[in-house]
């Protein structure tokens, strides 16, 4: 059996926050604003995985109204979901994700993100692809107001 899921997330850039994308701290004057650490890439991946198993969305498991998840490490949230997925007998076929940001440039960090995500999903790095793009200064990402991410995951049983 194969299952496909897709995920999307967006967070606003704000001062006085660390920028964490794909589980990697990126030096920048702003970070992403959110209830947790606001890791936009890991949130999109987590949502894609939850979608692939037909279990709703990330907000169902980790509501932003629950103080237990205040400033939560998104890598730990992904690991919690992945444990459920593995317990159900699924493994990663492949994952493809895109980060959409005007600044900072993500390309120097993509390989580190790929390795970290593969580690979190107990997968080979060849099963994980992460890429970065801009919107050519269009929209909220182009105006440097926020960062978005998309993810597609294939699970196999």
Curated annotation (Swiss-Prot):
It comes from Listeria monocytogenes serotype 4b (strain F2365). It comes from the Bacteria. It catalyses: 4-CDP-2-C-methyl-D-erythritol 2-phosphate = 2-C-methyl-D-erythritol 2,4-cyclic diphosphate + CMP. Pathway: Isoprenoid biosynthesis; isopentenyl diphosphate biosynthesis via DXP pathway; isopentenyl diphosphate from 1-deoxy-D-xylulose 5-phosphate: step 4/6. Belongs to the IspF family. Involved in the biosynthesis of isopentenyl diphosphate (IPP) and dimethylallyl diphosphate (DMAPP), two major building blocks of isoprenoid compounds. Catalyzes the conversion of 4-diphosphocytidyl-2-C-methyl-D-erythritol 2-phosphate (CDP-ME2P) to 2-C-methyl-D-erythritol 2,4-cyclodiphosphate (ME-CPP) with a corresponding release of cytidine 5-monophosphate (CMP). This is 2-C-methyl-D-erythritol 2,4-cyclodiphosphate synthase. A divalent metal cation binds at residues 9, 11, 43. Keywords: Isoprene biosynthesis, Lyase, Metal-binding. HAMAP family: IspF. One of its GO terms (molecular function) is metal ion binding. Binds 1 divalent metal cation per subunit. NCBIfam families: ispF. The keyword Cell division does not apply.
